């Protein structure tokens, strides 16, 4: 069973979608499209479509939505009004139903996308209650409590309803397969990778140029479109709809389908829909205990599989690593410092009136490695945070070549070529190594020499972490299982794979062994030799002595001394402030 699932997982998404449609059609053929079993199979498909949509919003984007039932109801009513009242063709009624969900999802996502998990849950729950009430109140359109009947499938405007019993079942089977394919494509796309990155580590994602807000709005819109399409299919399946079919419980049911199946996984929503439609129907034969057994079953399943039945969320990122594995070894040029790349001009940054940076100025040149050192709390990390846009400066400016970075968002600064690592690696647990590198891949056409050097550096960093870039299985595994050292190398490899102009490294040696530090130093030196300006914040003074061209010593938010590392130990003020020697 496990081997079969493994093989099915490895099929391309398009084939998986086709297979799903074929299986649904075969089962429908065996049971008869008008039979009770046929109805149940179609209901599973319809709910699966809505659950796949919710998996985009909640699973991929991590936005807890309790409002999937509202989009489902909206799609059902838009489709039912167009099909029943205006006698539109079924394909167009379904399409417009889905579009209504897309628009409603985007309209919800724009204000809701900036809220935290609880705020989002509250807004979406409010939406379900509002929509449910509107279905009753706007009876001129919705039929109020009586609902809408006569929802017949037509091929063209005002034509007679189609005779065939197969139109609706076939449409349901095809749309389910199509939605599964679209859902998988979404996860595999750059947008999907960005969405998961924001879910797992929003600050790390912003450092790669990803806008968290837009990924959430897109996920809301896509998730609602799926739900509305499911709702439209439900209207045709039932031929009659009323508000009773869309109680707030429906949204909870969709959520449980996603969580039970495995939030964020690609097969989970299908499994969730299958189980949560079939199990209650089987239990209906035992009316006194059915709810108790159903509840206990859910508890036991979640206890045994806390991340759901299908927990794997990482997806292959085709060709992401080919350029790394196939890259020929490149000779490393001698390192020379060139023109200024990054300049801090009198940067101040205060927190509640206390200045963490109080007028810091320094310059980093092309190909140069600058060590930013100083005692704990002297402002080193704050300086990196100001450069990469996480903290806007209180006053002063940071200039990247000719661009003033002050006031730009972290995403905008990252897109201009500033990459960084963090004291604690901000990698994305639900994404594979391949996906990390694919997400960070440069958007434009970088200088070929820089590109070759960066690819070589990425390969060597992965190897330093004991990861073989040619080992496809390892490269497609979720990074959540990786050790601290491996994550450090992965984070650095990710930052470098974007071919940055400036590389900021925050305590890269922390937690690494002596040999790992040495290997890391060689990679950083080679990247600098290819023209990248590097700033290293580090307490490991031996590493600083070996690696950097120039040291900038911070103390209490000001530059205490600047010069070559060899002279560091001879400067009294540095010894006093930094090493505690008075
Ligand atoms: N978000 C924040 N809110 C309030 N104070 C902050 C914030 N970030 C930094 N600080 C303060 O700014 C000062 C400088 O902190 P910073 O982390 O930049 O020092 P550091 O030199 O990197 O220290 P370490 O070597 O321990 O990492 C500290 O006093 C710190 O408490």
Regions found by a protein language model. Name each.
Residues 370-375:
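The feature captures the beta-strand-to-loop junction immediately N-terminal to the Walker
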Residues 388:
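Helix-to-loop junction immediately C-terminal to a conserved catalytic motif
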